Curated annotation (Swiss-Prot):
Active site (catalytic residues): 219
Modification after translation, per record: Glycosylated.
PANTHER family registered for this protein in UniProt: FERULOYL ESTERASE, UNNAMED PRODUCT-RELATED
Keyword vocabulary terms for this entry: Carbohydrate metabolism, Cellulose degradation, Glycoprotein, Hydrolase, Polysaccharide degradation, Secreted, Serine esterase, Signal
Organism field: Coprinopsis cinerea (strain Okayama-7 / 130 / ATCC MYA-4618 / FGSC 9003)
Sequence segments annotated as region (Disordered): 60-86
Coiled-coil annotated spans: none
InterPro entries associated with the record: AB_hydrolase_fold (IPR029058), CBD_sf (IPR035971), Cellulose-bd_dom_fun (IPR000254), Esterase_phb (IPR010126), Plant_Biomass_Hydrol_Est (IPR050955)
Descriptive protein name: Acetylxylan esterase
Domain of life, per lineage: Eukaryota
């Protein structure tokens, strides 16, 4: 069969176009309302994490930089202590935790909803390490967040901090409780209580620097990030929210059909109303609040982009600063993203033109790590 030059050129163009639009490792490849490319790079498969988000992963979905191919191991903690003072450092922290792999903590204190916690300690962990709590999206797991969003542990390898990966409790559809009064209240007896217990355990037993404790998460994990900053502002110095909603916005823990009004971006409140929802999480608290960094894409079909502005209103009100940005930086940290700073850097927002729900985009995690000072 002989092809005409014009047809041959067309075939070559199609091949080039398909190659250009193939989704790289950990990129979004599907989900309800998603209109971007769905074909993964060679050797990758499109893995459904929930109705709203599918991600390109390797066939075995194995973490690319771990030092072991073994599944997560479980260790028993040392006997609990009644003091909150950190131990005197006599060597590398957390000697009972294997370095360079994901390790499950079997017990870490008060855990009323039976969440699971996993720890990643890098080989070069600092003697006085920082701590990052990383919370998976709805439909995900701690292992999936560890493998599918590798930037956090890669930066832990480079900077020597410890990462705690939370996992939502059994029977939760792998979603965090972001609506109950118990979870939205300090020591209320739900998911937020268990996460805080794990942080307190790390502070008591691993020589973690209390000035370098941070929280981050995607989607449902982003919502829980906001909740942790609201319920335990004395534990966390800052949070980074990837595709989330304001505290007290959603009325259900799992995606709804038709969408919850908050999902659709139709829940609009005043800064004072949003701020009050944070303040109610810890009545009487008058200390400093965590700095907050908020990321959202304009093509997020799971949680409307309008939720970025509502979160900004909430946290600027909590910090008692203006809702007018002090600076705007286009093409930051990359083309298509716009950064806005509020007050003296207490709140930052990043709006991604054309970005979907699968945040963080690979390579943008470093901006959050720098914001934290890890």
């Amino acid at each position: 069969m002989v092809f005409s030059p014009r047809l041959s050129a067309f075939v070559a163009l199609v091949a080039l176009t398909n190659a250009a639009t193939a989704v790289p490792m950990y990129g979004q490849c599907g989900g309800s309302g998603y209109t971007g490319p769905t074909q993964c790079d060679p050797g990758l498969v499109c893995v459904k994490l929930n109705d709203w988000y599918s991600q390109c992963q390797s066939g075995g979905a194995q973490p690319p930089v771990t030092t072991t191919s073994s599944p997560p191991v479980t260790v028993s903690p040392p006997p609990s202590t009644t003091t909150v003072a950190p131990p005197v450092a006599t060597g590398p922290p957390a000697p009972e935790i294997p370095a360079g792999q994901l390790t499950q903590l079997r017990s870490f204190g008060n855990n009323p909803s039976n969440i699971s916690m996993f720890v990643y300690k890098p080989q070069n962990v600092k003697n006085r390490p920082g701590l990052l709590v990383a919370l998976h999206p709805c439909g995900g797991t701690a292992q999936q967040y560890f493998s599918g969003f590798p930037g956090f542990r890669q930066h832990a390898d480079q900077r020597g901090f410890i990462v705690l990966y939370g996992q939502s409790p059994p029977g939760s559809s792998n979603c965090w409780d972001i609506i109950s009064t118990a979870s939205l209240t300090r020591e209320g007896g739900d998911d937020s209580t268990g996460i805080a217990s794990a942080v307190k355990y790390a502070l008591q037993n691993w020589n973690v620097d209390p000035e370098k404790v941070f929280v981050t998460g995607t989607s449902s994990g982003a919502m829980m990030t906001n909740i942790m900053a609201a319920t335990y502002p004395d534990l966390f110095k800052a949070g980074a929210v990837w595709a989330g909603t304001a505290v007290g916005c959603l009325s259900a823990n799992t995606p709804q059909f038709p969408p919850d009004p908050c999902q659709s971006g139709t829940v609009i409140r005043t800064p004072q109303e949003w701020g009050d929802r944070v303040r109610r999480a810890y009545p009487g608290y008058n200390g400093p609040w965590p700095r907050m960094q908020i990321w959202h894409g304009t093509n997020d079909f799971a949680l409307d982009h309008k939720n970025l502005a509502e979160q900004m209103k909430q946290w600027t009100n909590v910090h008692n600063i203006s809702q007018t940005p002090t600076s705007t930086s286009p093409s930051t940290p990359r083309q298509g993203w716009t950064k806005q700073v509020y007050g003296n850097g207490l709140v930052e927002t990043f709006s991604g033109q054309g970005a979907g729900h699968g945040l963080p985009e690979s390579g943008t995690e470093v901006v959050a790590m720098d914001f934290f000072g890890l």
